[in-house]
Swiss-Prot record:
UniProt keyword list: Ribonucleoprotein, Ribosomal protein, RNA-binding, rRNA-binding
SUPFAM superfamilies: Translational machinery components
Segments passing through the bilayer: none
Bias (Basic residues) ranges: 9-20
Quaternary assembly: Part of the 50S ribosomal subunit; part of the 5S rRNA/L5/L18/L25 subcomplex. Contacts the 5S and 23S rRNAs.
Role this protein plays: This is one of the proteins that bind and probably mediate the attachment of the 5S RNA into the large ribosomal subunit, where it forms part of the central protuberance.
Protein family: Belongs to the universal ribosomal protein uL18 family.
Phylogenetic placement of the source organism: Bacteria, Bacillati, Bacillota, Bacilli, Bacillales
Example GO molecular function: structural constituent of ribosome
The protein, known as: Large ribosomal subunit protein uL18
Keyword Transferase among record annotations: no
Length: 119
């Protein structure tokens, strides 16, 4: 019998492999991306202290509206970059969360770069 591969399980395994190698510090925090079927979330995390420094998602009150999921991801990238720069964060380590660097993840990353985050 052929069994179907659970994509999320494989993604979590990939993410765990990446997380063993990268970690966010206070001077260079980690920009983490989580993507569900409907929404996208981004957090700037200091792993040393275990603190989220800035976050954004398309569920935020000041988000507005977006025509597509990719458009929403780029707006979330703008929001998280602005909130991080308000806290004095300019340089981050990008953690794509085990997702491919394509589509919504790529749109979020490029928008964050355009709005002042370096990675």
């Amino acid at each position: 019998m052929i069994t179907k591969i659970d994509k999320n399980k494989v993604r979590k395994k990939r993410h765990a492999r990446v997380r063993s190698k990268i970690s966010g510090t206070e001077s260079r925090p980690r920009l983490n991306v989580f993507r569900s079927n409907k929404n996208i979330y981004a957090q700037v995390i200091d792993d040393v202290n275990g603190v989220t420094l800035a976050s954004a998602s398309n569920l935020d009150k000041d988000f507005g509206s977006a025509e597509s999921k990719v458009d929403a991801a780029s707006k979330v990238g703008e929001l998280v970059a602005k909130r991080a720069s308000e806290k004095g964060i300019t340089s981050v380590t990008f953690d794509r969360g085990g997702y491919l660097y394509h589509g919504r993840v790529k749109a979020l990353a490029e928008a964050a770069r355009e709005n002042g985050l370096e990675f």
